[in-house]
């Protein structure tokens, strides 16, 4: 929804101390670097958010005379020995960069292999992972820190933090989880009307009083499962100061709709059906019912048949990019008239959801419908399938979500499905699973522990200064765009200058006298012996905290993500960029490393998020976060034409791991626009910083110019590899291009890159035609 970068000669290489007559200190450092290569900690992060070729618009793709002058100065200054940084931070950074590179590759042929070839050679995907990247490594290291603070019992903390620690201990209490086995799940099944496949005579005992409206409402409000119909509360796209009810098409049991009907996904479907059948059979036996495998298989096949119809009824994500086309506001009467769904009572359904938080529907209540095509198709599906199959499906979606909270035998039932879907053969080690779960559900409490243990508070002000530098470049770059008229440029400038930022963490999580943190989790009462029930509390708390907002004014200062997260975000409804503390660490950012790394790391991230405000989705929202068309017809038309260039460019990248499928340039357009804009803005901001007198430092053992160091650090945050199964899933579902395409596509379009590495026109990294939007 609208809620939610002539080969004049390669660089000089120094293969040994004697060739360049290095000084004693430099030689010593190079020896030290060699020793560090095997042990250097790679701590980077990455954030991961088809058409035919159209004539390209040349949007001032030159490098300005001023930028050329600065680059020449960079090249000149980079040859001086006095600027070599020999601090421990710089030595570690140099070791990391050297280890990740493959200097046998030519940067003008394939810069991704040149920058990341060493990383790809040295890292094997763990059996527990479907993907392994510098982002995953940084997340792993963050989880080690969180494990330490969650297990530390030496200090008594405030109630919110103690609850997080109790939740963690309950997750780690595997002996009790094994002893209780399926008991907690069976108790839940009784609460939600039973699971027909795991009981006898459901049609006679439960069927007569079964109501779809009430079942959907219970799953939504008590278990945070929005099945069949996705009803949720969010900022009104057209009035960002208020909340509104949204109705949309739902998610499915498998990650992508294509898995349900594409021929090449038959193995995944078979494993999914076997997973469903195994779980239902296990529960029947636990209830002392006959296994009746054939009966269970038949009933679950009907569930898969139903879900396949639902998948076909949904609209593919690539056709849902235009939020202005999705948004349809209507009253309850119109909703009922247009989508009767064979007698489905919309007022009853919505009121049952809201009554869980004591909110009453108003006579003139309006809803925003995003999923009109889906709702039009849903009526026939509801008419075809009986109540028993519908109930089997609804309960299955809850069971699927709760499997990870049960004993080991239930996890073993999903092994083949996970192997077919992700390529993984092992479950994640238990403590990591528990750390991730607690951080996801109690992000403010866990974030407070992380900040106290691992975050430098002065990073906030330094990053804020970087944001202003890169925002200024974005505004300056508007003057270079000949596809945009002055009226639209002025509006774009206003929006850019009004982008708000959140950096690191909200202050209240560290303020002992501020009770907001404890109040956030006041309704939760955890027990170390009741992990499954603790999870149900979290589901209910998350659902009801969201539902309560319907009658509340939007809090523009509310943090949309926790502090201990290795990612960054842009919210179009708030015109807000967010940089959690988890990403504000080396090598993305450090006051102790060269500025080339900071601008190529967190600077690129900042530019990426700013540009999201002007991608194919963000551009539909104004400076206040309202969905408003502030574009002239001329500028809007040319934005679409410029976008076609990028769609075509990225659609020509194929992914060998994903059976050589081509990237969907349309689905990935928003992220590609942000990648391109982000690296362009960060590089220009770096050149401006140098032009204004900034003095950078070189890294020992690396004969790289400042500009080359910038681009290598930018590329290396994307180093990573995928299992083939997950690559196939990602190319269907991920809005990001594959990692190598993210690097190659954005740098092919940037003149400053080809100048820094002397790439001749016509070489792979300096194509004859380039795309530019921002």
From Swiss-Prot:
Membrane topology field: Single-pass type II membrane protein
Outcome when changing residue 751 to A: Loss of function
Coiled-coil zones: 532-558
Effect annotated for changing residue 567 to G: Impairs the enzyme specificity
Cofactor dependency: Zn(2+)
Subcellular location, record wording: Membrane; Secreted
GO cellular component, one term: Golgi apparatus
PROSITE patterns with a match to the protein in the record: NEPRILYSIN, ZINC_PROTEASE
Note on cofactor: Binds 1 zinc ion per subunit.
GO function terms (MF aspect): endopeptidase activity; metalloendopeptidase activity; zinc ion binding
Effect in UniProt of substituting residue 739 to G: Impairs both substrate-binding and enzyme activity
Species in which this protein is naturally found: Rattus norvegicus
Tissue/organ expression: Specifically expressed in testis and central nervous system (CNS) (at protein level). Restricted to developing and differentiating fields of the CNS. The soluble form is expressed in round spermatides.
Entry's family note: Belongs to the peptidase M13 family.
Active site: 609, 675 (proton donor)
PTM info: N-glycosylated.
One GO process term, biological-process aspect: protein processing
Entry binding sites for a peptide: 131
Record-annotated site: Cleavage: 72-73
Protein's recorded name: Membrane metallo-endopeptidase-like 1
Transmembrane segments: 27-47
Lumenal side: 48-774
Domain (Peptidase M13): residue spans on this chain: 84-774
Motif residue range(s): Stop-transfer sequence: 14-21
UniProt: Zn(2+) binding residues: 608, 612, 671
